Each structure stands twice: as C-alpha cells, then as structure tokens.
Design a protein with these regions (language model features):
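Thiamine diphosphate
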Residues: 46-69, 75, 79, 89-100, ...
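Non-catalytic terminal/interface segments that mediate subunit docking, oligomerization
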Residues: 324-484, 489-499, 560-561, 582-603, ...
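A short, small-residue-rich loop immediately preceding and capping a beta-strand
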Residues: 12-16, 66-69, 96-114, 132-134, ...
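Conserved internal helical-beta-strand scaffold that buttresses enzyme catalytic cores
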Residues: 2-5, 14, 20-23, 28-71, ...
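Generic, well-ordered alpha-helical scaffold segments in large soluble proteins
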Residues: 2, 29-32, 83-89, 120-123, ...
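Conserved short loop/turn motifs at secondary-structure junctions
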Residues: 14-15, 26, 107-110, 142, ...
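A structural-propensity feature for long, helix-poor, extended segments
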Residues: 105-108, 112, 488-509, 514
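Cofactor-binding active-site loop characterized by glycine-rich and histidine/acidic residues
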Residues: 1-127, 150-151, 407-410, 417, ...
Length: 766
C-alpha cells in the first residue's frame, strides 16, 4: 500500500521478484483488488482447460500478471541484481529515466544457500545499485528442517552482506518486545537472545507461552522477574519483526531512502505463521496441505475473519464489499502509486528492422579471403551498429572474450559500460583499439561470469516489457559454457518470453582444436532443443548467418514473436561464397539444396551437413565421384531442431485431422523425389541429426561427435570422431551396400584406400 510503484508511475513501475512459494499470498491480494475472481482462485494449479492460476510466478502462463519467474530458487536474486544494473545502464546511456524506480527481490533464508543467491553481491555494491532492495524472509526453516539449527542465519547473512558492501537493515523483534527492551537496562535480553540458536527459536514458536517462559526467560533470574507479571498468552504473543507492520514499514522507508549502495532487509518471521498447532514453526509446515475444522476456527479467530461456524467447513473466500473502507483504501493507495502489481506489460514497441539488402557486404561473398563465421558475425554486428533506426538498441554482451572473438575494435567505437567511466589511463591508450570504458558505453563486459552475463542478457531481452523499450542483446560466449552452464536461467528466459540473440562461439566438438574435453561443444544444440521457444541454427556460410540474423530481428522486433535465437559460430577460417539465388526460405526453414549433381550415376546419395562439417561433406562428395563414380546432392542443413519442430507440427496435424488430406513435412517434401540414402554429418552428437529420422523418406544414417572431446588438430579430431570426409564416404558406401546396389568389396577397398583402421578406438567410450 505504500512503497511499490505501479507501471503508470512517472518513470515506470518498480520491478518485483516475488519469492515463488509466496504466490498464493499475491493471488489473495489480487483477489481483494478485484484483479482475480473467486473462480480463478478455485482453479489454483489447474491451468490446462480453465482460466486457472499457475503454481509459481510464470509469465508464460499468466503473461499480463507475472513479470519474472523466480523458481527454481536462486534465480530471483541473481536476476534482480543484473536487472537493477541494466536500469542504470539504460539511464546512463540516456535511453530511459529511472529515477525512483526500485528492483525488489523477496527471498527466503534457505534460498540464500544457493550459490546464485549470493555470488553476485559484490557486483551490486561495486556498481552502486541503490535501486536494488533484497528482502530476506528469515523464518529460520527450509523444507526439511532448520536453515541453521546450530547457528544463526540472520547474523551469518548480515556479515555476508556487510562484507560485500551492502546496507543492512534488520527487522528482528516486533513492537510487543519494546516495553521489555525499555526495562532491560543491563542487557540481559540481548545476552539471552545471542545465546539462543535458531533451532531454539524454532522450538519456541512450535510450542506455547509456558514453554517460552521456561526455556527462554527462566534461564536468568533477571529475565524471569521481567516477565513475572505477564501471562503465558502474553509471552506467546511477543512477536517477531517480520510480522509487525509498523516495523516492516520503518524498514522499507529507510531502504527506499538509502543512497549509494544496495540494501538488504533481514526480517525475522515464523514459517506457517497463523497456522498454530497445524504447522506454525514446525518441520512439517512445508508439506501441510489441509487444516482441521478446529484449526480453521483458531485461524479465523486469530485474524478476526468474519466467517460463521456453519460456513467454516466450506473454507469460503472472504472479501470485503467493494464499497467497504478497506477495499476503497487499498484501491486508492494503488492508484496513487501508479497501478497494480505484479503487472507485466504486453504493449510492445515495434522497431524498424533493416532489410536483407543492407547486409549485402556479407551475402555477396568474400572472394578468396578466408574468415570464420565468428568474424562474419562481427561484420554483421558492425552493420547493425551503423543503422540509425536500431543502433542505440544493440547491447553487445561478452564474458571477457572480446579479443577471442575479434571484437576489440568495438572498444573505441561504442565503449565498454562503466557507471564511473574510466578513472585510469589504460595501458593500451595509444593504440587504435584501446580498452575504453565510459558511463555511456554500450558493451556489457561481464568478466568471467557466464551466469551474470546471461542475466544481463535476460534483462535486455525482456526490456520490451519491463521498460517498454525494446533492446536487442547479442550475448557471445564459448558455446560449451552456455546451456550446459546456465540451463536453468535459459529455461527461465523462455518462460519470460525473452527476445534476443545468443551466439555460441567456438562451437563444434572438432572445430575448437587444442582446448580439450571441457571446452569442445558437441551438444549445445541438443540442449537448445529442450526450450520450446528457442530457435537454433548452425550456419556454415556468412550469407546464411546474415539471413538468420535478419530474420530473427524481423520475427522478434517487428512480427513480435515470443522467441529467442541461439546461433553457433566457429573459429575456423575458410572462404564464403556468394549467396545462391532463392535459398533464403530454406535457410530459415532449416535446409536447402546447396549443390545438385545432375549427372546422377547408378549409385547416388544425398549428403547433409552443417557448420564447418559441411565442408567435409563437400569434400566427401568429390571423393565419392572421383574414387567410386558415385554422385551426390549436397544439402546445407542450418537447423535440425527447426526441421524437427516443423515435422512434429505436421505429424500432429495429420493425427488430429484424419479426414483431411495429409500434409507433408518440409524434410519429406525436399527429399521424396531424391534418389539414394541420406547421410547427415554434424559436429555434434548424432542425436542432433537423428531428430528428423521420422520425416526422411529414404534410408537415413547419421554421423556425429558422441563422446568426450580432447585436444588435437582439427584433422585428427575429425578422424577420431569419424566425421571427416573419409568416414562420410565409408558411410555412404555402406548405405549403398545395404540398399543392394553396391558390392561390399567397395567398402573394403575404401578402408584400405583411406587407411581406416577397423579396430580403431570407439570415440563414444574412449
């Protein structure tokens, strides 16, 4: 009623990261406000065929209500830090006014054990995020038992936050303790409180006033005398600070006025508050689903809820009349503060997206010059940064890898964001591409911090809703340290309907040579396929990359599709041809015919490839024809994931519409008239290409890089993982033998010709 600014405020509303398990309380408040109906409350956790309410905050399920998913636990605090930082970034770049806006994160003390909860505290202080407020509900319990039964979680968190440079406000004891504190001139209360462990405090609230008198006050004569005139009921009602509205108000008021550093409020509470014998302060509270009639009556009486005994068994919802003083006041306060919360804006700004022609410097090919797709991406980014319509919206995000990816030229051009600018003279200041930090810098240089960098990407990718300002984030990183490292955050990004680009650099298990097992990515596209609204591509050529990026901009920022893009780019240099005519649709759909051999011998095969391995496929086609007089068609497959999605959609349509003429998947339509077996080779696990097997009308064999990576040259790695041109030829020959059109002696001949050892180590298990 007093602090949280709504979306109609002067500079926009506050951003609330609400503890997932408190969702029912938020729904109850929204019911009183008239935002939710009784029918909706009755359908809590029943969402499939009714207008129900999601279990936890999920924007995908309630897209105009919840802003941020905060489960699994730990995601909320990390996101909140980078959201507050992104508001400062936008403000310092002159894109928004954020004066007075706050980012609130409501957390649990048990949740603070998550590394994500505390791992970025120093960043918040270093960036001077005085627009950030954490409220930690310290009820001393987690699901199974005490958070720190043998210790004190509040003091532990206080030390942690103070050490990180935060402003700490503790709300420990409620107002009913104040008279006792006033009489305690010698500090006996403080002494006893410091002696008690959190396990003791849990026991006090799980029992009654007599127990508290005996085990807390009677330990010292001075304390025993202090409460000798208090009844057990009065002792029992000595409240904790987190349940005292006046104490909480005072803490919030102090927090919003604080300047210079982020603030944390540590509020001591009781888990199961109000449940009494049904679960207050007990270890079973989290699993308590029902209350007995007597327990319901006790709850009603404790909080003065006007429900009669004859109605109590129905557990009715209670809401004062709309013209009651309480509801009028509640609505008046929200109106004064700028509207209701939580609220997610679905009014989306539309950007003017450049046409593909503006990328002609990339799509026309590079002649004899050899570059990587990473460098092609940097060129595309440069084109976008020169576009007057969207250049200011571009947010390059890098976790200490700009030089790795050849992006250091952007340091001077657009600068690295720093809230204090550059207070030192960089060692390379006399060079053209020196390390330039600036208050209005555009690059978010995150250091070695993939989780934080991804949270910056989320903040930018959801700015169209949070700030009504569409931003276009490009986060480029080692592909192995993406979904595998921060998969939970990527899933949350999908839930939030994030829009932006993820660039998995140095991708491909055999393409990143020399760095070994933990760096070589052979499965990021497999992980990307698990997120329903993640659109992923593995392009080979610069023109494919340009088409994909331009289409992504169109889909996300003009068409307003709730998707985000994952694109793998490589560090292998090779030549990039001109874009063939009419391939744009195939690039976007996931495959197109790159080269057709119209001679077509008796034995003919279809060869598929993607990324850098497509070049091995092209080489294999030449070897097949030169060494065995076998012709082939070559397909560039930009996305097995997109082909699978389209195939499943067609399959479902046919299942659901048996009376209609069956549709054909795009894969089927492209291959149905093409003779010969299909061999698909990628730099990823075979399951990546296996996804389209149901839609391939021909015999289908896949090659991939299953197994652990290792350091060596690309040539050695590709032979080890059996994805080089020699193994593609061998596989094609075996497929023709299986078709009955080729004698197996040709396979034996090929193994001798290419020096393939039949007893070589199996890369899947070695």
């Amino acid at each position: 009623n007093y602090f949280f600014k709504g979306p109609k405020g002067e500079n926009g509303g506050d951003l609330l990261y609400i503890q997932g398990h408190s969702a029912p309380g938020i729904y109850a408040r929204a019911f009183l406000e008239g935002r939710l109906t009784e029918k909706q409350l009755e359908k809590f956790r029943q969402e499939v065929e009714v207008d129900g309410l999601s279990s936890y905050p999920h924007p995908w399920l309630m897209n105009d209500f919840w802003q941020f998913p905060t489960v699994s636990m730990g995601l909320g605090p990390l996101q909140a830090i980078y959201q507050a930082r992104f508001l400062k970034y936008l403000e310092n770049r002159g894109l928004i006014k954020a004066e007075g806006r706050k980012v609130w994160a409501f957390l649990g003390d048990g949740e603070m054990d998550e590394p994500e909860s505390v791992g970025a505290l120093s960043i918040a202080a270093r960036e001077k995020l005085d627009n950030l407020i954490f409220v930690v509900n310290c009820n001393l319990q987690r699901l199974d038992g005490p958070v720190r039964g043998n210790g004190k979680i509040i003091q532990e968190l206080e030390g942690l936050f103070r050490g990180a440079g935060w402003n700490v406000i503790k709300v420990i004891w409620g107002g009913r303790w104040d008279p006792l504190f006033a009489r305690d001139n010698q500090g006996w209360l403080q002494k006893r409180m410091e002696e008690c462990l959190d396990g003791d405090y849990q026991s006090y609230k799980a029992n009654d006033g007599s127990y508290v008198r005996q085990h807390f006050f009677n330990q010292y004569p001075e304390l025993k005398k202090m409460v000798e005139n208090m009844t057990d009921e009065e002792i029992w009602r000595l409240n904790r600070g987190g349940h005292d509205p006046q104490k909480v108000y005072a803490a919030y008021a102090r927090a919003v006025e604080h300047k210079g550093t982020p603030t944390v409020i540590l509020a001591k509470t009781i888990k199961g508050y109000g449940m009494g014998a049904a679960g207050e302060g007990q270890n079973i509270t989290h699993q308590q689903k029902k209350m007995t009639i007597d327990q319901l009556k006790a709850f009603r009486d404790r909080f003065n809820i006007p429900v009669s005994d004859d109605k109590i068994a129905d557990i009715p919802f209670y809401k004062p009349d709309d013209d009651s003083p309480e509801i009028k006041y509640l609505k008046k306060q929200r109106e004064a503060l700028g509207g209701y919360l939580p609220h997610r804006s679905i009014e989306v700004e539309q950007l003017k997206i450049p046409h593909l022609e503006e990328f002609s410097s990339i799509t026309k090919g590079l002649g004899d010059r050899e570059i990587s797709t990473t460098m092609a991406f940097v060129r595309i980014l440069s084109v976008l940064l020169k576009n007057k319509d969207i250049s200011s919206r571009i947010v390059p995000i890098v976790p200490d890898e700009c030089r790795t990816f050849g992006m250091e030229g952007l340091f001077r051009q657009i600068g690295i964001y720093s809230p204090v600018g550059q207070l030192y003279t960089p060692v390379d200041h006399e060079q053209v591409m020196y390390y330039r930090e600036a208050v209005d810098g555009q690059i978010l240089e995150e250091g070695i911090n993939e989780a934080g960098a991804f949270c910056s990407w989320i903040a930018a990718a959801t700015s169209y809703s949070s700030n009504k300002l569409a931003m276009i984030p490009f986060y480029i990183y080692y592909s192995m340290f993406g979904f595998q490292r921060i998969g939970d955050l990527a899933w949350a990004a999908g839930d939030m309907q994030a829009r932006g680009f993820l660039l998995g650099g140095t991708a491909g298990r055999t393409t990143l040579a020399g760095e070994g097992l933990q760096h070589q990515d052979g499965h990021s596209h497999v992980l990307a396929s698990t997120i329903p609204n993640c659109i992923s591509y593995d392009p080979t050529y610069a023109y494919e990359l340009a088409v994909i990026v331009q289409n992504g901009l169109y889909r996300m920022y003009e068409k307003q599709d709730n998707v985000f893009y994952y694109i793998t780019i490589m560090n292998e240099n090779y030549s990039h041809p001109d874009m063939p005519e009419g391939v744009e649709e195939g690039i976007i759909k996931g495959m197109y015919l790159l080269k057709e051999n119209k001679k077509k011998s008796k034995n003919h095969v279809q060869l598929m490839g993607c990324g850098t391995i497509l070049r091995e496929v092209i080489k294999a086609a030449e070897m097949l024809e030169e060494d065995f007089s076998i012709t082939s068609d070559i397909w560039s497959v930009t996305s097995f994931n997109e082909l699978r999605k389209e195939g499943l959609a067609v399959e479902r349509y046919n299942n659901m519409h048996p009376k209609n003429k069956p549709q054909q998947s795009y894969v089927t339509s492209q291959l149905k008239e093409r003779p010969g077996p299909v061999i698909a080779t990628t730099d990823y696990m075979r399951i990546y290409a296996d996804q389209i097997r149901p839609f391939v009308p021909n015999r289908y064999i896949t090659l991939g890089t299953d197994g652990y990576g290792r350091s060596d040259t690309r040539t050695q790695l590709r032979h080890f993982f059996e994805v080089d041109a020699k193994f593609i030829v061998l596989t094609a020959l075996n497929a023709l033998v299986a078709e009955g059109t080729l004698d197996k002696t040709k396979v034996v001949d090929a193994m001798k010709r290419y020096n393939i050892n039949p007893d070589k180590l199996n890369p899947m298990t070695h």
